[in-house]
Amino acid sequence: MTRTRVPAPSIVAALEHALGPVHGFVPLAEGEDSQAFAFRAEGLGSAAQAEHVVRIHRSREGFDKDDFAARRFARPGLPVPAVTAIGRVEDLSFEQSFEGPFFGKPFYCVSRRLPGSTLQDLPLDLVGPLAAPLARTLEELAASDLAGTTGFGRFDANGTGAHASWRAFLEAVAERDWSAARLDAQAMAGVERQLAIVRELAPSCPELRQLVHGDFGSSNVLTDGREITGVIDWSEALFGDPLYDVANLFFWRPWLACMEVQARYFERTLPADAGTAARLRCYQLHIGLRQIHDCALAGEAEDLLWALERNARIADQA
């Protein structure tokens, strides 16, 4: 992914132009493809003394989805930070603002800072007791009211999914431009086998239409060590089978220890039937294929190799 490298003074200038004087501006842990900072601003009305977060990204799309998710789905059982401002950083040196190709002026998104740390940053011995609260949060997420939304798969800031059915979303991974990935013959043979398995399993996957976060379980979940205090970054959110979120935990379990802990919890609690196992396999392969394609196009060789090997192992699980 292309990570922004916008100088802090440029970000402060954009915030002060929109919100007035900014105080306590400090960096936070970066996302995979974004920057993040905490701050306070006088122009936030009654919330002026509350801490806020500003994130910087080359695209606005994910920020608009964050705003949509906060307005539509936030409630006591599903804490989603309210978005207070979205804009562009105008004052910067373009050539030094990105790792990789130039994409134009980046966007910023200001949201209320929720308490807690990310699950990924939590000491591992504290993650186990959170497995049940995490599962309850996924249940709450899946129970969200989708009235006024349409479609399946990834949706836009208006709640419109890109596909007419869940099966269509799953099978669409084969329609990506795989020639642009420039994989060698051995890697492409593996991808073709995995695409065939997805096509074989997709018709048996239920046409459920519920809210799916799409990237749940590590840096996008906040906790105080007892409960879940925030679910953030809705850029990958979609409509479909909520088991897709569990499959994401399974796919990434070798990569992050906190995902392994959650995966083990669901291994103990999910139905032990062939249908559930087939859905998990299908969804993991789908997640992996998307990761392979994205990494190949971004030129991320190490991540690409990991994803290729991970998907090969999943494909071998009969």
PLM features: residue spans?
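Short amphipathic alpha-helical segments and helix-helix/interface helices
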Residues: 12, 70-71, 138, 192, ...
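Conserved N-terminal boundary motif of the eukaryotic protein kinase catalytic domain
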Residues: 19-27
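An alpha-helical support segment within catalytic cores of ATP-dependent transferases
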Residues: 4-18, 90-92, 102, 143-214, ...
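Short beta-strand segments
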Residues: 53-57, 84-85, 153, 211-214, ...
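Active-site acidic catalytic loop and adjacent metal/ATP-binding pocket
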Residues: 35-41, 54, 193-244
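ATP-binding pocket architecture of kinase catalytic cores
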Residues: 26-164, 206
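Short, surface-exposed alpha-helical segments at coil->helix boundaries
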Residues: 8-9, 67, 259, 263
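Helix-rich C-terminal or lid/interface subdomains of diverse kinases
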Residues: 61, 128, 132, 172, ...
